[in-house]
């Protein structure tokens, strides 16, 4: 693997830099699919807790042992040494996921990063059918040293890019070439 340098990774760098500079986190709209996934995750974790092992829900977990602060929001921790990552899948996609019998590529980094941050030696990847009514697939994932090294390198590169973006922004403000006005913060209106 290699460290991403694409539109998505560049946007993530700018989001981190802007959060640090402004102190604000941008809100994102919740779509129907996102809400369904959230609801399915909660239900699946109840089933897992009942049939496999209790899951402790946690907030944001951090780790600074790699020379910088990294963090993640795992779906849950299991006992003293494990964790879970739950993904809700439309039934046809769940069928293919079960046939393939592996963690889908789009979730591997997330699972391994959760293990890296938490320092836990295993993670259960849970793939569940949307709205239930089918088979939940559990795959136990253990750390991969090459993935761990790549993630640590990527975290350092991300931090370098965030710092560079912040410096470029501050330099642009200081050089006087733009007309800039301070904007007061406006709180979003919440409608019922």
Which residues does each PLM region occupy?
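Accessory terminal regions of nucleic-acid processing enzymes
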Residues: 1-192
